[in-house]
């Protein structure tokens, strides 16, 4: 069995620092409007060209196990920031590297790392408070477009996301998909949609589009499998008398029940489309209830004592229009009461707040969107697959940044929010010299994002930082034009949530690295000499 290799004190910290630097140097060249790209090798297919911090960080694995630990810790800064805020991963890596670099200098000079850590935490809390206090709420479409434009570094993408948000609202779902063409466009799906299509192709009304359209239909919603026609007959007779079409949403429709529906459709007696209920298990029950509330119907389920053969026409839902495709059903203009829908939306929002599972949160968010607004799909097009992947990543980042901005407001971009937060550290009381050192480390680190943006634009970072520090509040450096401007007026803004999260995560991991004294890793196994057993072949000469 391979043993373990252990390194201590200064050697341990230096190895971690090398790993931190390796990852941060690769990521930070992408920061700002003049940031460069990174090319990632792929085992299959063409290399990937990206400008996204977390995607680059995820690809980095170092051969030295101790240095790799440092790189993996910074990777955690990037992924955690991405999970919470959806953007700001490069900034988080830059901040983490700065805190580690300054901190290790002081630890090597004899400072107590535990007390430095206390100073770092105190300063970060104060800086985060300053960032939150300076945040401005955003409402207008143009402000949303500015946030998205800065994140994606592309005005067209910014406007596209602002359009999508305007159409589906803050609670709406916006998904990003790869397009077949070369243009990027926005598609809005109005009403509630779910990924189940017609059970039988005989039910279609438009042979060219291969879809069924029902105008002003009744909607039967049940969690039961329908196979006996007797269960449906009493209800079918009432629907036929009304002269309206019928949409059946059930666990399944099969056997003679399906044959009866298809036969009536083909004879022209009445129009009916059957689809399977969306989702599985408890989620299916919840989604059927959502559809019932949206359409003003009742879920016919034996759990509450309702039987299909006793169902009345009053228990059916209504909608202005229903479109059923091969794999999708869209209900437009449900006749449900606005009060009931509002209550249901509030209930789902509460569940989103309480759930800890990311998967559940995502599914609840989808249900919320279908009830509250609709779904917007951004179709990403490009001339090559490599460009498309890069564009898709940028759009996803911009979308996350925009959601974060709507949630917690915006602050001046271009690293200016961190420079402004420096003033909040001025009167901070340090209990000891080492604690003051911790505060000063954060003070220096807060300048680093602006310094890096200027450096990527080919300028001397320290000069730009000093000019911004001495300028009026809100004035920053526009790296694209090389001018000093009011950042919010110029539309250079960052979401407060992204700015805050990047600093908190960077400080958390960096402080852990500073207080590390020992590293333990697997000892690499020496490769066995596979040719060693061939030595005995020298005796083959006597075989003649």
Curated annotation (Swiss-Prot):
Where is this protein found? Answer: Cytoplasm
Enzyme Commission number(s) from the entry: 5.6.1.7
Q: Which organism is it from?
A: Pelotomaculum thermopropionicum (strain DSM 13744 / JCM 10971 / SI)
Gene name linked to the record: groEL
Which is a GO BP term held by this UniProt record? Answer: protein refolding
Q: Its Gene Ontology molecular function terms? A: ATP binding; ATP-dependent protein folding chaperone; isomerase activity; unfolded protein binding
**What name does UniProt use for this protein?**
Chaperonin GroEL
Domain of life of the organism encoding this protein = Bacteria
Q: Which EC main class describes this enzyme?
A: isomerase
Residues that coordinate or bind ATP: 30-33, 87-91, 414, 478-480, 494
Q: Which family does it belong to?
A: Belongs to the chaperonin (HSP60) family.
């Amino acid at each position: 069995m391979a043993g373990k290799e252990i390194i201590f004190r200064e050697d341990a910290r230096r190895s971690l620092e090398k790993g931190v630097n390796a990852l941060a140097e690769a990521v930070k060249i992408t920061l700002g409007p003049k940031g460069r790209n990174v090319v990632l090798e792929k085992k299959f297919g063409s290399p990937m060209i990206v400008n996204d911090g977390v995607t680059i960080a995820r690809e980095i694995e170092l051969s030295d196990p101790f240095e790799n630990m440092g790189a993996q810790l910074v990777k955690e800064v990037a992924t955690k920031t991405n999970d919470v805020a959806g953007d700001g991963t490069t900034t988080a890596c830059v901040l983490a590297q700065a805190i580690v670099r300054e901190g290790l200098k002081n630890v090597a000079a004899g400072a107590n790392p535990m007390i430095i850590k206390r100073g770092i935490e105190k300063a970060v809390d104060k800086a985060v408070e300053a960032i939150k206090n300076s945040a401005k709420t955003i409402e207008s479409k143009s402000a949303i477009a500015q946030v998205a434009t800065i994140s994606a570094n592309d005005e067209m993408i910014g406007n596209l996301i602002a359009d999508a948000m305007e159409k589906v609202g803050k609670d709406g779902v916006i998904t990003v998909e790869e397009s077949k063409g070369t243009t990027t466009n926005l598609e809005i799906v109005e009403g509630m949609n779910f990924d189940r299509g017609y059970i039988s192709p005989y039910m279609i009304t438009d042979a060219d589009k291969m879809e069924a359209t029902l105008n002003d239909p009744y909607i039967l919603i049940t969690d039961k499998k329908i196979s006996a026609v007797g269960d449906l007959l009493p209800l079918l007779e009432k629907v036929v008398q009304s002269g309206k079409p019928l949409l059946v949403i059930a666990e399944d429709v099969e056997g003679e029940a399906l044959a009866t529906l298809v036969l009536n459709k083909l004879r022209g007696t009445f129009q009916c489309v059957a689809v399977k209920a969306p989702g599985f298990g408890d989620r299916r029950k919840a989604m059927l209830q959502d559809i019932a509330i949206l359409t003003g119907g009742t879920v016919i389920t034996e759990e509450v004592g309702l039987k299909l053969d006793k169902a009345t026409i009053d228990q059916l839902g209504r909608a202005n229009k229903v479109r059923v495709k091969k794999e999708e059903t869209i209900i437009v203009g449900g006749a449900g009461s606005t009060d009931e829908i509002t209550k249901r939306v509030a209930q789902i929002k509460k569940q989103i707040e309480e759930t800890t599972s990311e998967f559940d949160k995502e599914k609840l968010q989808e249900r919320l969107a279908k009830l509250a607004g609709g779904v917007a799909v951004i179709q990403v097009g490009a001339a090559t697959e490599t460009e498309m992947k890069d564009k898709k990543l940028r759009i996803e980042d911009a979308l996350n940044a925009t959601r974060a901005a709507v949630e917690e407001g915006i602050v001046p971009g271009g690293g200016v929010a961190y420079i402004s937060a420096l003033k909040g550290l001025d009167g901070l009381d340090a209990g000891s010299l080492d604690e003051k050192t911790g505060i000063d480390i954060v003070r220096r680190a807060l300048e680093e994002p602006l310094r890096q943006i200027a450096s990527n634009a080919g300028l001397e970072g320290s000069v730009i930082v000093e000019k911004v520090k001495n300028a009026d509040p809100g004035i920053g450096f526009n790296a694209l034009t090389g001018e000093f401007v009011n950042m919010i007026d110029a539309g250079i803004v960052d979401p407060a949530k992204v700015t805050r999260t990047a600093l908190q995560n960077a400080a958390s991991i960096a402080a852990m690295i500073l207080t590390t004294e020992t590293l333990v890793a697997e000892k690499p196994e020496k490769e066995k000499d596979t040719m060693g057993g061939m030595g005995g072949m020298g005796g083959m000469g006597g075989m003649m």
